[in-house]
Structures are given as C-alpha cells and as structure tokens.
Amino acid sequence: MSKIKETEIDYEEVERRIEVKELTNEIDTPDGIINFLEKRNGIHNFDFRNRYSVLDLVHCQRKSYYKQLGVKQEELLADVSGMWVTVRGDLLHEMTHAYKWREMDMEYKVTLDDGREATVAGRLDMYDWKTKTIIDLKTTKTVRWQIKHGILPRLEHILQVQCYYTMFSDVIPVENLNLVYADMQDIVTYRVKKNDLSGWIKTRIKDIEDSITRKSTPSGETSGLCQFCKYQSRCFDDGNGIEHKPLSAPKKKEDNENGS
C-alpha cells in the first residue's frame, strides 16, 4: 500500500488570501482608461454626427461641414518645415507637465432648436488650481515678429480659451484665462477676458447644421491655416474658398484599399 505524502498547509497564507478576497471585488476597468487606450489605437465608438471639437467651432466652418459629412481627408504634400513644426510642437508641449492638472477633457452638451443634442469636446492644456487659471499653450514660430505685425494674438485663439471657460466653469472654479505663445526663443502670455460663449457656440453649430440640411456648402473662412488643411482640393473645387494651388491631394486608391 502506497503512502500519500502529506502537503504542509500554510494557514497564515490561507488567512491572508481570505482577507484580501473580503477586502476587494473585481469590477469593470474605468471608462477613462478604456477611452485613453481606444484613442491611442485609433478606435472611436462615438457618432461623429452632431459632435464637434472646440477647434471645429473657432476655425473654418467649411472644414467642420466637410467633417460632419464624412468627407475623406486628403494627404498633405509634406515638407521638411512641416515635420519640424510637429517636432517643435511636441518639444514645447512638454511644458504642460509643469502643472499636475493638465490635458483635462470635457464634453459640453448643446440643445438645438429642433430638440437634437450636439456635443462639444474640449481639452485644457493646463489648469493652475492655486490661482484658478485656465492656461492654453500655442506653439508657433517668430512669436515676437508676429506680435509686432499684429498677427498675434489671434481671434480664434481667444475664442478657444473663452469656449473652455464656458465649458469648464460649472465644473472647476475659473478666475483667469491665460493664452501662452511660445517658440524656441520666446514665451509671451496674454490675459484673456472671461466671456460666456454659450450662445455663440449654439449659433456656430446651428449654422453648420443648417448648411448640411440645405446641402449648401458654406463659404471658406480662409487664413494662413489653410495650408495645413486636409480638404484643400475639395475646398478649391467648391469655390468661395482657397484660391492658391491645393497643398493636399486625395489619397491614392491603393492607400485607401490598405486602410492607410
């Protein structure tokens, strides 16, 4: 008759495991983590219709119109300076780590006249909780030169910060709005006047939605940013928009088939 080897039981370990089990309960992963991972992997589970970013509202309405229609974005004719703009922006945006409260997301609901609900998504660069200040960082080149020639500060940047004030002021206390322009040599900060843009936001969305209903392309709001737009060929062909040779082109057929 074979002998069964007895296994020594660690009763202290058993008791520890029981205690841990009683103190914890597995739940679903928080939505914030899931949303972060999905965004990093290009997964979006929301309907883009009736959904706008703050940038959609403060920049060209025609661009927002194309986006709402689902018009495919074109490929920019990239150059070295364009790549440097990206690198410069990445380097300077490291400054946002100066504040613990940074890259804060918010969704702001707007009820339209027909009862539909539109969503405006915004993200704060930085928030100083000590001084209750919203801080938005803009990276550019030749800051001092642009200020001297009246290019900076831009109206759309002012509207953007005021939109953040409108969206966030019911959630966090806001006493100051700061707009920061930075290049690799200079940093210049402006204090922006607080202004409730809830009515302006609703009107801006309504104008875009009305254009979609009428199937009438809004006029392009041309600016220096047009050279970075990914709808330039479409805008040029539709008229009342850019007049320069488009610096973007529809993606090649093989690229579309490969999903790139």
Across the structure, where does each feature detected by a protein language model lie?
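Metal-dependent nuclease catalytic cores that hydrolyze phosphodiester bonds in DNA/RNA
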Residues: 1-134, 141-148
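Metal-dependent nuclease catalytic regions and adjoining charged, substrate-binding loops involved
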Residues: 2-29, 151, 163-260
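A generic fold-level signal
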Residues: 119-121, 156, 221
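Active-site-adjacent bridging/hinge elements
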Residues: 134-136, 204
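Short connector loops/turns at beta-strand edges and beta->alpha or beta->beta junctions
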Residues: 138-142, 182-185
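Short, conserved glycine- and acidic-residue-centered signature motifs
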Residues: 153-160
